């Protein structure tokens, strides 16, 4: 019996799943961030070691990493996996979005909106992507972009902020004092990650019709829809019917995000018949499918 291990290594957390040939779950583990670009090396290795603690000896391993952006980072990812498990096995490293796409094989396009954002799909047997440039150069419609709007609204208009937003900020930062909040963002190992934790507040406030939140949802979902439209025009121009799988924490935070996204997407590409659903299986299962390909010689 072979043991297949998949890892979903993101900017907020890392998860490990081991399964056998029959699809039985043998192990699940979780720890902190494991982004190959933004997570410090020592912390990344400790987090993966903690997430994999107790995992049975693997035969085939695939780690899907945020921050895997070059052949060099791929090789680094493979080396980290080899060190983490410390046993003879077959290893591969792929970008984190590949796991989400493989977890939803029935979808034409996967739109990921978590801490960051990215659009990916299959085209002529290859996986193609748009976006994914990080919170400084992109991440349209990401948890970071909404969380930043939420915190900025509070800092600029604390007296007009809802009780829900105030509670969420205090839960994340432990204070409502401006100096503590600003310091907390800039001293965070990943500013994007800590700000993304405020996305639920934006969804809640948008549902209540609070202006800053409704404007934030409309603006960022318009940008994300425009990114998807560019992806479709370039990679799926002849398609008049497309299915989209929505992955990431933003879609779980509130129905407001999906509703606004669909409105703007239809405005961008009115000729396309859209079918849209939340990712039905966690990306971890896609990572396991990628590990299985190692056994099939793909």
Label every model-predicted segment.
Residues 72-76, 102-106, 121-124, 257:
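Short, conserved acidic/polar surface loops in the N-terminal third of protein domains
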């Amino acid at each position: 019996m072979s043991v297949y291990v998949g890892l979903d290594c993101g900017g907020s957390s890392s998860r490990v799943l081991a399964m056998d040939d029959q699809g039985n779950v043998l192990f699940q583990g979780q720890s902190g961030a494991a982004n190959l670009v933004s997570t410090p090396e020592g912390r990344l290795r400790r987090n993966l070691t903690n997430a994999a603690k107790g995992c049975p000896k693997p035969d085939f391993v695939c780690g899907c990493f945020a921050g895997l952006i070059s052949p060099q980072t791929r090789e680094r990812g493979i080396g980290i996996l080899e060190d983490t498990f410390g046993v003879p096995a077959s290893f591969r490293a792929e970008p984190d979005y590949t796991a989400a796409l493989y977890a939803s094989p029935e979808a034409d396009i996967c739109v990921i909106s978590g801490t960051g954002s990215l659009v990916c799909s299959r085209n002529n047997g290859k996986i193609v992507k748009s976006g994914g440039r990080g919170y400084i150069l992109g991440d349209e419609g990401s948890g970071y972009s909404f969380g930043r709007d939420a915190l900025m609204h509070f800092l600029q208009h604390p007296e007009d902020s809802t009780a829900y937003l105030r509670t969420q900020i205090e839960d994340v930062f432990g204070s409502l004092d401006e100096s503590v909040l600003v310091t907390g963002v800039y001293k965070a190992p990943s500013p994007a990650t800590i700000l993304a934790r405020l996305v639920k507040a934006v969804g809640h406030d948008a549902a209540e019709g609070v202006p800053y939140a409704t404007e934030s949802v409309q603006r960022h979902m318009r940008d994300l829809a425009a990114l998807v439209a560019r992806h479709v025009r370039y990679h799926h121009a002849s398609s008049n019917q497309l299915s989209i799988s929505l992955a990431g924490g933003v879609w779980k935070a509130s129905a407001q995000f999906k509703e606004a996204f669909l409105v703007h997407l239809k405005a961008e590409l009115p000729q396309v018949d859209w079918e849209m659903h939340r990712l039905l299986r966690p990306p971890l299962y896609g990572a396991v499918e990628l590990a299985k390909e190692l056994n099939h010689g793909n």
